[in-house]
């Protein structure tokens, strides 16, 4: 009797348990990647703010020195310009390093979304036309994990493109108002929608990373 019971076990359970474990790992990875993104975003804003302050400071010095045309002031102007260029280059390199870090995070987000899509395709192959599929955890169908992952991915993909533009323009603009607008864009991340945190927390709750 016992042997017969063992013989009735289908291969579905181990396939789904592997899928559930992978999706749970992905949810934790999403959480960790977003935390790392926020840390880099804050660091990038500090650097961008330093770039803005440096440029505004130079503009103010230029206005003051326009009132003086002595040889001494000319020599001092060249010295200040050289120091400014060196400092600006250093800050721009720091901002580029931050962008490189954000790019690596976004690539990892793409892999998470791709993996979740693959799990959905595996489940479709496994169940075929069957409409009733048991949820891997509590209530979410597997496809919902992909929908949430894809939505988060698109937010951060667009945000990364915006930050690249901001970093490029910030180093070249001489307009203080435009500079402040770029800083605001970097800080407030307009493409990361307000419900992104809700999506993440819901996924963590569904997969058991948060207590019900």
Curated annotation (Swiss-Prot):
In-chain residues carrying the UniProt-annotated modification Phosphoserine: 69, 73
Post-translational events: Phosphorylated by CDC7 but not by CDK2.
Coiled coil: 73-107
Keyword terms: Acetylation, Cell cycle, Cell division, Coiled coil, DNA damage, DNA repair, DNA replication, Nucleus, Phosphoprotein, Ribosome biogenesis
Residues given in the record as Na(+) binding sites: 202
Span of the signal peptide: none
Gene: CINP
Outcome of swapping residue 162 to R: Loss of interaction with AFG2A and AFG2B
The protein's name in its UniProt record: Cyclin-dependent kinase 2-interacting protein
Gene Ontology BP terms: cell division; DNA repair; DNA replication; ribosomal large subunit biogenesis
InterPro entries, alphabetized: Cyclin-dep_Kinase_2_interact
Sequence similarity: Belongs to the CINP family.
Functional summary from the UniProt entry: Component of the DNA replication complex, which interacts with two kinases, CDK2 and CDC7, thereby providing a functional and physical link between CDK2 and CDC7 during firing of the origins of replication. Regulates ATR-mediated checkpoint signaling in response to DNA damage. Part of the 55LCC heterohexameric ATPase complex which is chromatin-associated and promotes replisome proteostasis to maintain replication fork progression and genome stability. Required for replication fork progression, sister chromatid cohesion, and chromosome stability.
Oligomer status and interactors: Homodimer. Part of the 55LCC heterohexameric ATPase complex composed at least of AIRIM, AFG2A, AFG2B and CINP. Interacts with AIRIM. Interacts with CDK2 and CDC7. Interacts with the components of the replication complex, MCM2, MCM3, MCM4, MCM5, MCM6, MCM7 and with ORC2-containing complexes. Interacts with ATRIP. Interacts with CEP152. Associates with pre-60S ribosomal particles.
Organism of derivation: Homo sapiens (Human)
One example GO MF annotation: preribosome binding
Location(s) in or outside the cell: Nucleus
Residues found modified as N-acetylmethionine: 1
Gene Ontology annotations for the cellular component aspect, listed alphabetically: nucleus
Top-level taxonomy: Eukaryota, Metazoa, Chordata, Craniata, Vertebrata
Effect caused by changing residue 184 to R: Strongly decreases interaction with AFG2A and AFG2B
